[in-house]
Amino acid sequence: MSLIDIQNLTIKNTSEKSLIKGIDLKIFSQQINALIGESGAGKSLIAKALLEYLPFDLTCTYYSYQFDGENVSRLSKYYGHTIGYISQNYAESFNDHTKLGKQLTAIYRKHYKSSKEEALSKIDKALSWVNLQSKDILNKYSFQLSGGQLERVYIASVLMLEPKLIIADEPVASLDALNGNQVMDLLQHIVLEHGQTLFIITHNLSHVLKYCQYINVLKEGQIIEQGNIDHFKYEHLHPYTEQLIKYRTQLKRDYYD
């Protein structure tokens, strides 16, 4: 069953050039779904379109958009407690003049009616998931942490809300190999054991083949191939997909992607 089903998604710029060209996309419930492709293909644009985060100079249209079996016009009301978003711009998620403990507590209590103690308990649990300890984080400011630490705090801030769907745009790109694999193991555990759904945009093809159940391949704004992991491991593939999987490298990113 698909958690998100969007038909004929098109994204255009002010010159009416189509950046995303009428794609059909399903995100399957309780699975790790992946979107892969070269830089500039439009992967991050799709994630932002799903969340209504597109830049003002881009327009988005679609024929139909369903979330959990219901037609929706806006997903913003689901953001946070139902849909979590892990973006590439984690450094912009926290201010520099408030301690992280206070910021995380405010985020949690914005979405759930809870005491400060209950919020801190959820925060502590989420930080432990990303291999951090509350005593090392909560009394610090964001600028006192390394980039890798801050990204893990950001991931924890999404996970602590226990969203039904997590949309993750390069969630481990700034982490070292060990912490990156640990975070991917954690995300896999959340999907398998707690029934959550993950839609991941990544350049790491090794992670895709190891963790994902369903894969979408994007090229120049069009989805050229879709299928479950067995299709990508054992069946004849589009030449472009074969090339991506053959190299299994992290592809270069650009401004939009």
Curated annotation (Swiss-Prot):
The keyword Endoplasmic reticulum does not apply. It is a peripheral membrane protein. Its EC number is 7.2.2.11. ATP binds at residues 37-44. Residues 4-245 form the ABC transporter domain. Pfam families: ABC_tran (PF00005). It catalyses: Ni(2+)(out) + ATP + H2O = Ni(2+)(in) + ADP + phosphate + H(+). One of its GO terms (cellular component) is plasma membrane. It comes from the Bacteria. InterPro entries: AAA+_ATPase, ABC_Ni/Peptide_Import, ABC_transporter-like_ATP-bd, P-loop_NTPase. GO terms for molecular function: ABC-type nickel transporter activity; ATP binding; ATP hydrolysis activity. Keywords: ATP-binding, Cell membrane, Ion transport, Membrane, Nickel, Nickel transport, Nucleotide-binding, Translocase, Transport. It is found in: Cell membrane. Disulfide bonds: none annotated. Belongs to the ABC transporter superfamily. The complex is composed of two ATP-binding proteins (NikD and NikE), two transmembrane proteins (NikB and NikC) and a solute-binding protein (NikA). Part of the ABC transporter complex NikABCDE (Opp2) involved in nickel import. Probably responsible for energy coupling to the transport system. This is Nickel import system ATP-binding protein NikD. The lineage of its organism: Bacteria, Bacillati, Bacillota, Bacilli, Bacillales. The gene is nikD.
